[in-house]
């Protein structure tokens, strides 16, 4: 995800020098590619608690790794199919022919990138479950570096070599995904618990793959719900005027950047919960997740504080429009509160992942974000962006309550071990 995000940002910047139709074709494809990759990554997070449960047992761990690869193949192919269908989606949606004519092979390159990224996510999810976050970071940084270097070179060209334009962007992002996946799989093969063991997918164990999907697919559905509702919010902001639309878009980007810290902390709690889960130690499970919530809160507050202090130079990187900057500055306190609540709900959501019970998260998202989607347009029409972000804050606050309540109740079912409950 880090490599694809960095690649998308760089490609957007460099394609701005090309024809407007080219940038529009890029945006159209990314509108499908981004939720597709995020959904696949969400589905593969279901692998994490299963690998964490066997972090010291190679004989039990190896089949889980292979099952994760089969889940990656299945979800990756579905995501790739969606991205490859961008020309048909655009045609059915009434996208101008000029934009569609610029697509060329780009959707097919990005479809391949979805499948490659899925295989990489299978490895990184396994590494997270094993508590090897440094290897995950190394894989992400390798892909990011490749995207940052290759994107401008392949799109605009280097020296006497002509750029490839939009196909160059696709090649760069596919290469970055391949490098990230290769580094992740290399790191996985070097883990002591899997040393000298064949890590190919082997023969699929359908029931075991379905068990992984039972945890991962509700997570994928929550990702789709979140993307869909954020799209509704973007439309609500765009109905005001272009300045408010830009301010909203940049504010969402800022929340996404800060939110990555909460995701990292939330994922890191899963291997910490695993030993308590094995022992059916309810208190230990809850303590580990609460510690993750406190850590995520601290990380988000730290990054948010830096953002608040450096708000002027940071915003100048996103826009030179004074009106848009003023609007973002006015929203900044709300933006930071939204990130804090989003971070807390995410950690409790990962707590549910750790105990392999993710359907409650899906229900919480469906209710809270469903209400937000219904209220977004009328609230924005009456109160502008402030009302919109207050509504988002309210939805996230309800999510915190819902996720925490579900986690507390579902973790209580793990078993009673004397004084180990609270």
Map each language-model feature to its residues.
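Transmembrane alpha-helix boundary and packing residues in multipass membrane permease domains
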Residues: 1, 9-13, 49, 87-88, ...
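Helix-loop interface residues and adjacent transmembrane-helix termini in multi-pass membrane transporters
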Residues: 17-20, 54, 129-130, 160-163, ...
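Small-residue-rich hydrophobic transmembrane alpha-helices
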Residues: 25-76, 80, 120-129, 247-305, ...
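Membrane-helix interface/capping residues of multi-pass secondary transporters
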Residues: 12, 20-23, 133, 166, ...
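Alpha-helical transmembrane segments of multi-pass membrane transporters/permeases
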Residues: 126-153, 167-170, 283-296, 351-374, ...
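Transmembrane helix-bundle signature of multi-pass secondary active exporters and lipid flippases
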Residues: 1-45, 49, 113-114, 210, ...
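Short alpha-helical transmembrane segments in multi-pass integral membrane proteins
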Residues: 51-115, 146-153, 161-217, 273-338, ...
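Hydrophobic positions within alpha-helical transmembrane segments
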Residues: 26-29, 33, 106-109, 127, ...
């Amino acid at each position: 995800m880090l490599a694809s995000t960095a690649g998308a940002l760089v490609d957007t910047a460099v394609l701005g020098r090309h024809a407007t139709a080219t940038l529009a074709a890029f945006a159209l494809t990314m509108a499908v590619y981004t939720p597709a990759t995020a959904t696949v990554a969400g589905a593969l997070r279901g692998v994490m608690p299963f690998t964490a449960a066997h972090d010291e047992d190679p004989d039990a761990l190896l089949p889980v790794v292979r099952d994760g690869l089969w889940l990656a193949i299945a979800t990756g192919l579905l995501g790739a199919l969606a991205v490859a269908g961008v020309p048909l989606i655009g045609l059915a949606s009434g996208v101008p022919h000029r934009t569609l004519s610029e697509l060329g092979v780009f959707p097919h390159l990005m479809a391949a990138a979805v499948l490659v990224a899925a295989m990489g996510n299978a490895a990184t999810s396994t590494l997270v479950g094993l508590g090897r976050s440094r290897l995950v970071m190394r894989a992400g940084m390798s892909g990011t570096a490749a995207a940052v270097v290759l994107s401008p070179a392949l799109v605009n060209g280097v020296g006497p070599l002509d750029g490839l334009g939009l196909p160059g962007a696709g090649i760069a992002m596919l290469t970055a995904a391949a490098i990230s996946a290769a580094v992740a799989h290399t790191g996985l093969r070097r883990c002591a618990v899997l040393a000298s063991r064949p890590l190919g997918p082997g023969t699929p164990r359908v029931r075991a793959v379905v068990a992984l999907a039972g945890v991962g697919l509700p997570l994928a559905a929550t990702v789709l719900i979140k993307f869909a509702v954020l799209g509704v919010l973007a439309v609500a902001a765009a109905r005001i005027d272009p300045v408010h639309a830009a301010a909203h878009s940049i504010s969402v980007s800022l929340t996404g950047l800060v939110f990555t810290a909460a995701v990292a902390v939330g994922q890191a709690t899963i291997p910490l919960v695993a030993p308590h889960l094995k022992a059916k130690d309810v208190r230990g499970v809850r303590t580990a997740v609460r510690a993750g919530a406190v850590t995520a809160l601290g990380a988000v507050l730290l990054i948010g504080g830096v953002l608040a202090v450096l708000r002027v130079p940071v915003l100048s990187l996103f826009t030179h429009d004074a009106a848009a900057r003023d609007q973002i500055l006015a929203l900044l306190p709300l933006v930071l509160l939204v990130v804090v609540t989003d971070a807390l709900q995410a950690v409790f959501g990962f707590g549910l992942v750790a105990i392999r019970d993710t359907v409650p998260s899906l229900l919480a998202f469906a209710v809270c974000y469903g209400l937000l989607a219904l209220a977004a347009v009328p609230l924005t029409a009456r109160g502008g962006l402030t009302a919109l972000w207050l509504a988002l804050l309210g939805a996230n606050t309800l999510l915190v309550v819902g996720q925490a309540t579900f986690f507390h109740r579902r973790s209580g079912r793990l078993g009673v071990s004397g004084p180990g409950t609270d």
